[in-house]
Design a protein with these regions (language model features):
Chain B
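Long, compositionally biased, intrinsically disordered segments
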Residues: 31, 86, 122-125
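Bacterial N-terminal signal peptides that target proteins for export
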Residues: 2-12
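C-terminal capping alpha-helices of c-type cytochrome domains
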Residues: 101-125
Length: 430, 125
């Protein structure tokens, strides 16, 4: 590419970025109204989205405790009490059949619609890349909080739309009085401090390795338990259906079911504990722990994955994560080390990620992220991702971000080894 | 003679109690309804009135005052269903102190916690 052409593209990119920013700010100006919460938990529990989220879907400390307790409000108060207080006597009587039936008070369904416009400096038609997505999800509890459930399913959309892996699972909360949460179904392994491992995105970029991702949803069983109020242990087994090779005629052999094993241990210092209890802050004395919390996590995954030759080969992942939260600042670090057996030699993978978020208020946040992927120590790939998030309502979010991707392996194929993409996405949940 | 004095003192004390009772209940009067519901601070102790100004300006930033009024009058937090007592007022105060968008400092949180404790006492009278 010539220098002038490059400059022209840079100029166009700068103008486009500025236009997006101005557009977003204009939306910010005209859409600012009082926050309204709508999705399933908000309706069921009659509380606003920010009870559990900073800007959705990112969970705050209380939201993390709510999720880890199988969607039960930390504190363990029976649902019937809530109904008595928030409803009139007449409403309470009409709701009694719901309580006796042990079903949620409201239909526990929500939907999320997404629209993404993407700019790619290396595409001929830079701006003509639109992605849409629609996702249905439901979650809640049955039987007076004894059983929680979750499902999400894409209702359609285009590749590149922001939907997660389809999941359907149930969680038994303290079954038979045993203080554990037992989850079963098609689930994404709980290996991370966050909804997904910080390195997940980077590892998925290593498509040349294989499509294996520890967080992809599989049929499995998972058990988790709090160790005291500030530590958690999770162990799971999932069942992957993997091909085992071809016969002499080149036909696939019968698909064999293979079990993978995984686990994690997490610990939290400061902040709200896993039972949703606030730290004991002295209102007469200042301490750094008034606002500081540090979470640490270590995970491991051992399993197998069939490659392009349909042969099962071992896959291992080990990782560590850390989160530091102080007032409006959030720092996240993640490192994953893994090994994939191949038909030739084992491939070693290292992914490192760091992200800093600053939440100015429930409507506006900025984020900067750095990802690094190293496969067998050759030509490491690095991606820098700055982003701005604006949520005019608690259930509507706009995100403007860019990705500056340095990938030396592309140089060998004659492509530019450094690419810049930008995207503006809008998500609406209700 | 003595019996008459005792009787007179008894009736005087009873009349005083009867007169004072409605005043105490009137301390926790509210005005408006729904989203506009608020405490009527006219019957508050003098030092609580300045604390109410903090509550009035800070707490309604994220939720209605009705939520606080229901909690104080019933002794049960309306969303969680958990008891709303002196332990809970401090826990909620700390929760709001640590909430990134509350913009409340420790002195302000302490003042609001003291006010809620005072209101709980008044509601219990």
């Amino acid at each position: 590419m010539g220098v002038s052409a490059r400059r022209s593209r840079v100029h166009r990119f700068t103008c486009a970025g500025a236009a997006f920013a101005v557009g977003t700010l204009l939306l910010a100006t005209f859409c600012a109204t009082p926050a309204e919460a709508i999705p399933a938990f908000s309706r069921e529990l009659k509380t606003e989205c920010t009870t559990c989220h900073t800007i959705f879907p990112q969970l705050n400390e209380f939201g993390q405790a709510f999720e880890k307790n199988g969607f039960v409000w930390p504190g363990g108060v029976a649902k019937s009490k809530k109904v008595k207080v928030t409803q009139t006597e007449e409403e309470r009587k009409s709701a009694e059949f719901i309580n006796l039936s042990g079903i949620p008070n409201t239909l526990p369904l929500s939907a999320s619609l997404g629209l993404t416009y993407r700019y790619d400096e290396d595409k001929e038609d830079n701006f003509d890349q639109k992605f849409y997505s629609a996702e249905l999800f439901g979650a809640g509890t049955f039987g007076g909080d004894k059983i929680g459930f979750w499902f999400n399913e894409s209702l359609g959309g285009q590749s590149g739309g922001p939907t997660g892996p389809s999941q359907v699972w149930f969680v038994a909360n303290h079954p038979f009085g045993v203080p554990v949460h037992l989850k079963a179904g098609r689930l994404s392994p709980d290996l991370s401090l966050w909804k997904t491992t910080l390195n997940g995105r980077m590892l998925s970029m290593g498509a040349n390795i294989n499509s294996f991702l520890v967080t992809s949803a599989q049929s499995g069983v998972e058990i988790s338990s709090f160790l005291g109020s500030r530590a958690i242990a999770v162990f799971g087994v999932n069942d992957r259906n993997n091909a085992v090779g071809k016969d002499a005629d080149g036909k696939d052999l019968a698909v064999r079911s293979v079990n993978d094993f995984y686990g994690r241990v997490g610990v939290k210092f400061g902040g709200t504990d896993f039972h949703g209890k606030e730290p004991d802050v002295d209102l007469d004395k200042d301490s750094v722990w008034d606002y500081l919390s540090i979470s640490l996590n270590a995970f491991g995954y051992s399993g197998s994955q069939s490659g392009p030759d349909h042969v099962n080969r071992d896959v291992t992942r080990f990782g560590a994560e850390a989160e530091v939260a102080y007032k409006k600042l959030l720092l996240m670090f993640g490192a994953t080390r893994g090994e994939n057996d191949t038909s030739k030699a084992a491939v070693e993978i290292t992914a490192l990620s760091a992200e800093v978020d600053y939440v100015f208020n429930p409507m506006f946040a900025v984020a900067l992220r750095y990802d690094h992927l190293d496969v067998d120590g050759k030509d490491p790939r690095a991606v820098v991702t700055p982003g701005v998030i604006y949520a005019p309502f608690q259930s509507v979010k706009f995100r403007l971000s860019a990705a500056i991707d340095s990938n030396p392996t592309l140089a060998a194929t004659g492509k530019a080894d450094k690419t810049t993409t930008a995207q503006l996405s809008a998500t609406l949940s209700f | 003679m003595n019996a008459n004095r005792v009787r007179t003192a008894f009736f005087a004390a009873a009349a005083l109690c009867l007169a004072a009772a409605p005043l105490a209940a009137a301390d926790l009067k509210t005005v408006g309804s729904g989203d506009a519901m608020n405490f009527d601070p006219s019957g508050f102790r003098e030092e609580m009135k300045s604390k109410f100004e903090i509550m009035r300006s800070k707490c309604v930033k994220c939720h209605t005052m009705e939520r606080t009024i229901v909690a104080i009058k019933t002794g049960v937090a309306p969303i969680s269903g958990q008891p709303f007592d002196r332990g809970a007022t401090k826990a909620y105060g700390i929760k709001m102190l640590r909430k990134p968008d509350s913009d409340m400092n420790k002195d302000q949180v302490k003042a609001v916690v003291e006010l809620m404790n005072y209101l709980l006492d008044e509601a219990a009278r």
